[in-house]
Amino acid sequence: MTRLSVNVNKIATLRNARGGNVPDVLRVALDCERFGAQGITVHPRPDERHIRRSDVYDLKKALTTEFNIEGNPDERFIRLIEEIRPEQVTMVPDAPDVLTSNAGWDVARNYDHLCRLVERFHAWGIRTSIFIDTDLDNISWAAKTGTDRIELYTEPYAAAYHKDMAAAVQPYVKASVHAHSLGLGINAGHDLNLDNLRYFAERLPYLDEVSIGHALIADALYLGLEETIRQYRDQLAL
């Protein structure tokens, strides 16, 4: 069964919009676990416009499910990972001012850098994942780095879903089969929601994990957090 990791960045965005500690990121994350989430994801950025470094430390102390930290692996991020030692680190090639992740790694061009990162994170006992598009050659390069997993960037799937579902998912099916043949685990994330998730999960073989934040938190405004997580888990209970 594919695991659901809830990204709590949007909770931090809401908190920071007003100041103070409402909503409480830690409490929401723990409630997500209690309601059935199988992991918690955060993506701290240098300007701390949502998740703060202090949040990351607080979450590490309290979480009982897998903790996944995403981010651009600059030296500050690497130091944070060394201190926190999450279960998984997802390397994302974000520019500091980007609104949200919008592309995967060109692994061939960044191969030596990613190899060094994977080796470093493995030395600390951390599972690694490289954020990536569906290009098969790029996935082959990712496997050569020694990474444990890739995370497929799913915004193109979500954007094309209502035009032609089969065509939208096909590159991801091929990417998943190829990655699995190379010994890679497969994660996925970006713009997955209650409308498009089941179709994606049903057709994608070997899908280990999805991380979902924006859509899930938006749905929770109407459905409540517990019911929302239940519905997302149902989409993955294949």
UniProtKB/Swiss-Prot annotation:
Enzyme Commission identifier(s): 2.6.99.2
Protein name according to UniProt: Pyridoxine 5'-phosphate synthase
Localisation per UniProt entry: Cytoplasm
Catalytic residues (UniProt): H43, E70, H190
Main EC class the enzyme belongs to: transferase
Ligand binding (3-amino-2-oxopropyl phosphate): N7, R18, D191, G213, H214
Highest taxon, organism lineage: Bacteria
Biochemical pathway: Cofactor biosynthesis; pyridoxine 5'-phosphate biosynthesis; pyridoxine 5'-phosphate from D-erythrose 4-phosphate: step 5/5
Catalytic activity field: 3-amino-2-oxopropyl phosphate + 1-deoxy-D-xylulose 5-phosphate = pyridoxine 5'-phosphate + phosphate + 2 H2O + H(+)
Entry binding sites for 1-deoxy-D-xylulose 5-phosphate: R45, H50, T100
Site feature Transition state stabilizer, where: E151
Membrane-spanning parts: none
Pfam families per the UniProt record, alphabetical: PdxJ (PF03740)
GO BP annotation list: pyridoxine biosynthetic process
GO molecular function, one term: pyridoxine 5'-phosphate synthase activity
Record function comment: Catalyzes the complicated ring closure reaction between the two acyclic compounds 1-deoxy-D-xylulose-5-phosphate (DXP) and 3-amino-2-oxopropyl phosphate (1-amino-acetone-3-phosphate or AAP) to form pyridoxine 5'-phosphate (PNP) and inorganic phosphate.
Main subcellular location: cytoplasm
GO cellular component: cytosol
Keyword Transferase set for record: yes
InterPro entries per UniProt: Aldolase_TIM, PyrdxlP_synth_PdxJ, Pyridoxine-5'_phos_synth
Subunit annotation: Homooctamer; tetramer of dimers.
UniProt lineage: Bacteria, Pseudomonadati, Bacteroidota, Bacteroidia, Bacteroidales
Organism this protein belongs to: Porphyromonas gingivalis (strain ATCC BAA-308 / W83)
Keywords (A to Z) from UniProt: Cytoplasm, Pyridoxine biosynthesis, Transferase
Family: Belongs to the PNP synthase family.
